[in-house]
Amino acid sequence: MASTFSDTFSASKGELMRRAEDGLAANVGDSGLTTGEKVALTCRVLFDAGHDSGLAGQITARAEQPGTYYTQRLGLGFDEITAGNLLVVDEDLNVLAGDGMANPANRFHSWVYRGRPDVQCIVHTHAFHVAALSMLEVPLVVSQMDTTPLYDDCAFLADWPGVPVGNEEGEIISAALGDKKAVLLAHHGQLVAGASVEEACSLAVLIERAAALQLAAMAAGPIKELPERLAREAHDWTLRPQRSQANFAYYARRALTRHPDVLTG
């Protein structure tokens, strides 16, 4: 074993990264949870991570039938969501499964899903530091290693379109998002569009941390930019599916400890 370890000291960074990728592929996989269970866990994870703002915000994920998705019932906070009280709605927000009604603001989720077939999960919240940063009408600045999954992957909507319950807001927000993973919405909050529930949950945790770091750094002095090549390398490295799965598994364990009812039917 010592000999094998020593052999890696002459390896290039690229080779070591490939070895690590192979290790991730061999050791990290899907949790086996249903999509609804993952959405419910994401609600609890983000509640604990400071994304609570009363009944504001929605966390959705594509359901099994095309053109449908899971969402919360209007009137429930993130800390009350379980796998059993989620709704399944169509693009027009008609309830197909579950009791109650969806938040009318889910309409812009429908616009994003329709325009981005690659998106499997959307997290929209008014997290405290994100909301504070949004009041300054400035883009998110990614300048710290932990937040590089968002490097050059967070758009900015500088104009507040008002309460997002109409098709106009859906068009504006989905256009601002473009092909990015996230968008900071001035005077509003944030939206993350993930390739999986795990990725969306992880990025939502990170965008609130990135906003908090940016506000703290701005108070101390000018923020220095990351070297572009290294930042892109870090973005691609940290945004791999297995990394999102590993992150989510950790967040889920914490959520299950604090909220043992989350997976109840």
Model region roles, listed by residue range:
Residues 2-265:
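Glycine-rich flexible loops
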